[in-house]
Amino acid sequence: MKLHNYTIMPLDTDHLEEICEDIKHQYENGTATCALFMMTLVPEGNPPVDKVGILCKKYDLFRDRLAEMGLGSGVLLQASIGHGWVLSEMYPYQSYTGIDSGDTVRVVCPYDEGFRDYIKHAFTVIASHKPDTIMLDDDFRLLSARLGGCGCPLHVARFNELWGEGASFTREEISAMLDDPGEIGDRANEIFIYTQHEAMIDCARLMREGSDSVDPSLPGTFCCVGNNVECAAEIAEILAGEGNPRVVRLNNGHYTQPCNHNFSNVFRNAAESIAKLRERVDVILAETDTCPQNRYSTSAMSLHTHFTGTLLEGARGAKHWITRLHAWEPESGAAYRRILGKYCGFYEALADIVPHLHHRGCCIPVTGTPQFDRRKVSGGSGGWSNCVLERMGLPFFFAAEPSGIVCLDGAADAIYSDKQMESVLSGNVFLASDTAKRLIDRGFGDDLGVDIRDWTGKQPSYEMLPYRNNECSVQCGIRELVPMSDAVIEHSTVYHSVSRVNPERLFPGATVYNNARGGKAFVFCGTPNVHYSLTTSFSFLNQSRKQQLIDMMRMAGQLPAYYAGDEEVYFRAANVDDGSLFCAVFNLGMDPIDAITLGCETVPQKMEMLDCDGTRKAVAFTVNEEAKTVTVDTPAYTLAPVILFLS
């Protein structure tokens, strides 16, 4: 199936011919399937300047020239209520007002009737200029990445109307009510969240009415912000138009990053969003933004890795920002076009494989339920994935349905009800001590095999790991693990010592327990979730700890394959419906891998690699029977993902 790949283009009439030729090239080489011309329509001036009229005249020139070339195009409404940037002149409409601070920002409240007329007119005008599609950008939001929600006079009035009983609460009073732990807080959050969503959804309906007045079949798509995908499914359905797929671009951008650490967070964000959208929309797009669209911000290989990893989570295309929009610098986009064109077949083949994958290894849980009540935890944690697993070459994945080894730290357990947690604990779990303490407080202590206590004794000096009896620094956030059964296995030990003389055992560093539910609980005395630094990270980031995790994953039956070296590798493993084993190798480090060495549960008889054109080609490999490793005769360069099939 073809992917939905959009490319954002400027309405730069001084370079009309060059831009149209570029679009033709992008279509022909597989970079994009639809070009969207950017229109920034956040109102400015009093009365507002007729931006849509001015920009549509420019659009006509591009539309007509592309039509002569047999090509289509659409429009990106890049700003509607506004991203909050400085405006040349203020508009005459109600501004967004933070519910807590009372601060106003340069964003329009979509409850404002004048603005609603303005934006409906804009959609009507755009539709009359006959684009192939209209995409609404991600400034159209109120709760996500804003000041806690809009508490402007219009929203306060609507809140009071819905509360009833002649209510006349002030913004400050509503803000306080939202934090109330009891029934008042429950009702206040329900009504407040409703007002935020109502303002957006009603405004989106007016946008669609504008399009429908010209062409009810004109497709529309939506870009959301935040892992809670604020109203995204509802808005996408409204904007889609008669008989068209519901399309949402999720929010997982990765531009202006100082390094490749935490790259997996891009994919966790995608997984969080897709878990909430999967059954409600038809097409999900990656946010492959390179803002401000040059390689000083985002390398072409970073873009390639980003797109590849997001396809693995279930995306079926992307909104590519690969063209400088405010300067004529076509050189800045050349490398992006080369990589996306070269791998277009790879992306399509990978997207087609994804529905047939059954992931193995460590499971980083995400939630399929949006949570806007600020009193509650809205998602899991990326401590295990960001801080440990994405660098160790051990297989892990993101999922709303727990399987494999569920990895929890901090308050991540809060995404599960008690009944769900019973199910989780009937399987395999990696628990940081802070999460284990929370589970004990919830009544699940018998499932863990240990009690968790604050340590008030002698200073922990080091932890001894089973691999070669090597020592490492103590874990951060350390607590005492107290075994409550002889069946608890002490997998590593924390010691006190002065200059390594006469070491004194303090307590376990990690334990293993087979509980009565049939599950296996691995509890660590600290947490992996730390800021990357010399003094915090390297209790987990070392080869001896990696070997401990390998042993534990084998005990859980969740290690079909892993990357055996010490390069920083993000690794995925999954059983495929055809009986083969799928492996994805993402080299996130700066050192090239000349040949990929995998530890394998079962030695393969055959190995194939997904080529850039989407075909599979056989690759040579050698087997080390003693080490149970397989060395694949193919390199893995930095940010150049390698997809393998073992059978």
Where are these regions (language model features)?
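The substrate-binding groove and active-site-proximal loops of carbohydrate-active enzymes
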Residues: 4-14, 41-56, 101-117, 184-202, ...
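Hydrophobic targeting/anchoring helices
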Residues: 30, 38-40, 132, 143-146, ...
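Catalytic domains of carbohydrate-active enzymes, especially glycoside hydrolases
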Residues: 17-43, 128-133, 305-317, 388-398
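Conserved, mostly hydrophobic/aromatic
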Residues: 119, 126, 134, 211, ...
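Short, acidic/polar
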Residues: 12-28, 113-126, 232-238, 299-308
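A conserved amphipathic helix/loop scaffold
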Residues: 381, 386, 391, 398-401, ...
